[in-house]
Amino acid sequence: MKRALLISGGGSWGAFGGGTLARLNRSYNTVVGVSTGSLLAPLAALNEWELLKEGYTNVSNSDIFDNYWYMQTPLSKSGRLRKLPIIISLILGDKSICTSNALRNTIDKFFPEYYFIELNRQHKEILVGTQNYFQVPSKIHYFSSANEKYEDFKDWMWCSANFPFFTSLVKKSWKDYNGNYHVGLWSDGGITDLVGLDQLMYKDYKEIDIVLHRTKNIEKYEGNKINNLVENVTTSINAMRYDIEFEYFFEKIKNLNVGGSKVTIYWLPRKLSKNSMVFNQEEMTKWWEEGYETALDENRIQVFGPIKS
């Protein structure tokens, strides 16, 4: 029986999804990830839960960012904006307020080549989605572990996990369906595609699990206090994402149901923090454990059964 897993973006909230997946401990033929989902995907496909837990509970901000655009304070777990580096970045005309080469090195650490080889040996496919901003309008592309070389695939994971404005925009060439090479400017795959449902259409998956780093009752942004530029940008992006993402989300699930697939969504029980771009080890450890403990909680699970014709 073919089974697939889709994992959404969510930054540090990926620790909660990782704990949930560790509790489920299922085998999947295909795993599709965008943003933080692309980082979870390879080890989740191989059921390497201890290493995945280490990655999502022991990383710090220095493992993600090359320079800090905020600093944590005893009174605020979401951090306080560091204005000077942002002002300097704006004056210099940088594409983002910081870079994330440290994240690329962290991917090297937690996804060594023998795991990539093992994925292919077990015939498991990982698809990671990343957005090309050189295309107008910008377009998401999915890159497969079955078709990419090891170093290139890690680059695509990195591209997928880079949030616009905050982290690196990566310039990298890519090959189209006709074999022609083009140069792209890549960033977060989760901006316009929630979990990559289109990648599973017409492929006869009997069971599809979706780990969403969102709450079932979509948060309303009206009335939220916005303290600075960063919060303004993240709030605006998230508001637009909800409009784009959920407009066709359940319609696509229905299409999968008609095709004979059972779809199970695992939602967050609540909004975990104000800013998912803050990587706090203590908080992420708690989220991993809570994700593990509540994985089978009926309030988190939404099931859509196959529709018989």
Regions found by a protein language model. Give the residues of each.
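Patatin-like phospholipase
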Residues: 1-34, 42-309
